[in-house]
């Protein structure tokens, strides 16, 4: 009981920063101004169609809403500057946009304060390293070698918009703010697909709809909060058979207290969720749950997650969305890498005096490779090659200068190598580089109405240097020009970078136009 209350208080402690009543005052501009961490420029809100609104406009609009004459004029003159007229195109594209984005700025303030409260400056680089996407792969490499089963999860969706508001009620104590949130959700009823479709959730980031992104992150945060709580409580069940019954009663009492807040959810005992080695990772609406337990234990966790979504989020989760695989016999797609834990057999001959014998050693290794087919499909969708991987020119870029074309192709190639530097096999990456290099040459040749061979002879080594990665440039400085050096063997080792904070656009085809 005390442990649960202490765990909940850590989450509730953030409520002291929630100042939502200020949303209905003109002082919102001061908070939004400080939120931008820039004392000279106000916060810019990027809305639909790439329109930018200053937070100063939010302040002026809220002041205007408080003016009684404005509301009277809106009623007496419905065709003149009516705020709540949904048929008014200017309202749809401007007033509602800056109000919803301004609301999102305010509700993000408590979360930003938590992130900015770093204890010391010397710990900031370490915190930034943990933000890197590549930082999770060394963790998987260290932990997955000792695990047996892997579950592929999908965050429950679609989620009803009213449930999103109810989830925020536990954190937001300001009733008018919740009413305003419901107003935005009702107005954006045609945006319902942004929450109810995972494909649209990725497009949500592209549209930069801050309000809906905040709602989705809050929903996922609540989902993981209860999952983490139950995982931590299950660790106390590692007892012998003689003491299981007493601990089971003690644990059920905790669940009864927990059921006061959410009645009707924990009606079944969950004493069988005993797994001290369980790891959870999530990205893009998907998650993986790995453990060292038996297959029966994983099936029970699967049943629990299905009931969890049904009782708490009022969502019927199909059991097919949770797949259970054995780590040594399968591979999984994670953040653009095809990862697996194969068992490598090593035969060692041991000589002892006059006797010799062979030792068969089996070792696990966390392996990451680059999937060729999805990346070639992304390049094909971006019009760099055909569906079979044959390079083609990109006519849209022929109006650019030669150096701009070279820079764009070279930057895409270097970013691909940089992001997939952790692959144990670089053959796919060199194939992608060949596609981009030849596509660049054909684009330049098409612009100058020349042949590819003629244009490559004209540029010479300058054309090739644009496609060198940072590692290849270092290796090229170590050898003279007369030395024949192959870069294919220099990248046999995997390299993880701690400065990658976003996934490559070509890795996620949904981000491409």
Swiss-Prot record:
Record bears the keyword Transmembrane helix: no
The UniProt record lists the keyword RNA-binding: yes
Subcellular locations according to the entry: Plastid, Chloroplast
Position of the signal peptide: none
MF GO annotations: RNA binding
Gene Ontology biological-process annotations: mRNA processing; RNA splicing; tRNA processing
InterPro entries noted in UniProt: Domain_X, Maturase_MatK, Maturase_MatK_N
Disulphide bonds in the chain: none
Classification via Pfam families: Intron_maturas2, MatK_N
Domain of life: Eukaryota
Key words of the record: Chloroplast, mRNA processing, Plastid, RNA-binding, tRNA processing
One GO cellular component term noted in the UniProt record for this chain: chloroplast
Family, per entry: Belongs to the intron maturase 2 family. MatK subfamily.
Physiological role: Usually encoded in the trnK tRNA gene intron. Probably assists in splicing its own and other chloroplast group II introns.
The protein, known as: Maturase K
Origin species: Phragmites australis (Common reed)
